[in-house]
UniProtKB/Swiss-Prot annotation:
Gene Ontology CC terms, in alphabetical order: large ribosomal subunit
Biased composition (Basic and acidic residues): 11-22
MF terms in GO: structural constituent of ribosome
Any single GO BP term: translation
Keywords: Ribonucleoprotein, Ribosomal protein
InterPro entries named in the record: Ribosomal_bL32, Ribosomal_bL32_bact, Ribosomal_zn-bd
Name of protein: Large ribosomal subunit protein bL32
Disordered, as annotated region: 1-22
């Protein structure tokens, strides 16, 4: 059975664990239609456009 030869120091242990719980910042791009910030590869929440065409209905268009 494999057994560690030396005790893992708290510093080494914490460095190993640090990458698992690391939070990466959200990357935002601007919508080509309205200029609102949106997530990449997602339809715009403000106007509903994605890839140059209307992808989903928004509250403003559904009300009219």
């Amino acid at each position: 059975m494999a057994v560690p030869k030396r005790k893992t120091t708290p510093s080494k242990r914490d460095m190993r664990r640090a990458n698992h719980d690391k939070v990466t910042p959200v990357q935002l791009v601007s919508c080509e239609n309205c200029g609102e910030a949106r997530l990449p590869h997602r339809a715009c929440g403000a106007c509903g456009h994605y890839n140059g065409r209307k992808a989903k209905a928004t509250k403003a268009t559904a009300a009219s």
